[in-house]
Amino acid sequence: MATLSRFLKKRSLASNRLFSTQLPHTNIKSEVSQLIGKTPMVYLKKVTEGCGAYIAVKQEMFQPTSSIKDRPALAMINDAEKKGLISPEKTTLIEPTSGNMGISMAFMAAMKGYKMVLTMPSYTSMERRVTMRAFGADLILTDPTKGMGGTVKKAYELLESTPNAFMLQQFSNPANTQVHFDTTGPEIWEETLGNVDIFVMGIGSGGTVTGVGLYLKSKNPNVKIYGLEPTESNILNGGKPGPHHITGNGVGSKPDIVDMDLMEEVLMVSSEDAVNMARELAVKEGLMVGISSGANTVAALRLAQKPENKGKLIVTVHASFGERYLSSVLYQDLRKEAENMQPVSVD
């Protein structure tokens, strides 16, 4: 079986090389990574009733794997390849993740021909696990009580024991920030015609808020940048790490790449408020998004309600699609309801 798998993989790679030299002249993308970026923005209308400011949201659910993490996954792999640190079919990539970055990494590894090993806390959703495995990645779950710290520790253990292994280190990799300076920031500036006044974004690795913030500030120093973290794990506000449901934010330590001086403030949003807002966005705005997107919206609404921000344009991000959270606290009640539904008789 292993021999057959290797044969099919080699045949696929050979076919791809042949295919790439024989493409007809069209506007069709030659590979799926070219679909990354240039996501649309939309104004929120119903959940913003009573606010004095406008809120526009960049919809990263339109990325190939339905999350913003496709951007840094592609950037970090390309950067490492250019530096000669990794090569397809030879390097095993190992990365700790809370979910979306792992999915994006697995997606890129499958496309480029890398073996991918991911470590992840066991409290993350079943959808994340299945999606990573669907892309061919190996997945190791870690003790949920150890949080992301335990996940990172396990990844480093694997890095030391695995031949030809490499870790892209999203929490300290400058390419994670640079891709948002090069793509996400300019896209926001162009779509708002330079009229953005405030940008607010949850802090996980810190790549998005730092990269976008630096770009917007370079275009207009008066743009205000805000971060946010879970109330239950508010280490950037001097608190202690703790369990929460805003997956992807509040990793329990200050990431190396986050620029705290860039931000006016790091707002705090509770898991309960984030979950409730994500649900509300689905039924009121038709936007089915994840929990961190709910948190971003809560923070944007708080800023929009401040008298000093009346008439201003606030931009935030919906980082991922809500279908990835069906088994999580976000939709677990609806899932149980759906599982218990009984068919009606039809005459």
UniProtKB/Swiss-Prot annotation:
The record's subcellular location field reads: Mitochondrion
- What gene name does this entry carry? PCAS-2
**So which domain of life are we looking at?**
Eukaryota
Alphabetical list of InterPro entries matching this protein: Cys_synth, Cys_Synth/Cystath_Beta-Synth, CysK, P-phosphate_BS, TrpB-like_PALP, TrpB-like_PALP_sf
As for family, the record states: Belongs to the cysteine synthase/cystathionine beta-synthase family.
Presence of the UniProt keyword Transferase in the record: yes
Induction conditions: Slightly down-regulated by ethylene treatment. No effect from wounding.
Q: Provide the protein name.
A: Bifunctional L-3-cyanoalanine synthase/cysteine synthase 2, mitochondrial
Q: What is its EC number?
A: 2.5.1.47, 4.4.1.9
Q: Which organism is it from?
A: Solanum tuberosum
Could you confirm whether the keyword Metal-binding appears in this record? no
| Mutagenesis / variant outcome for changing residue 157 to N/Q | No effect on catalytic activities
How does it associate, per the subunit comment? Answer: Homodimer.
Q: Which reaction does it catalyse?
A: O-acetyl-L-serine + hydrogen sulfide = L-cysteine + acetate; hydrogen cyanide + L-cysteine = 3-cyano-L-alanine + hydrogen sulfide + H(+)
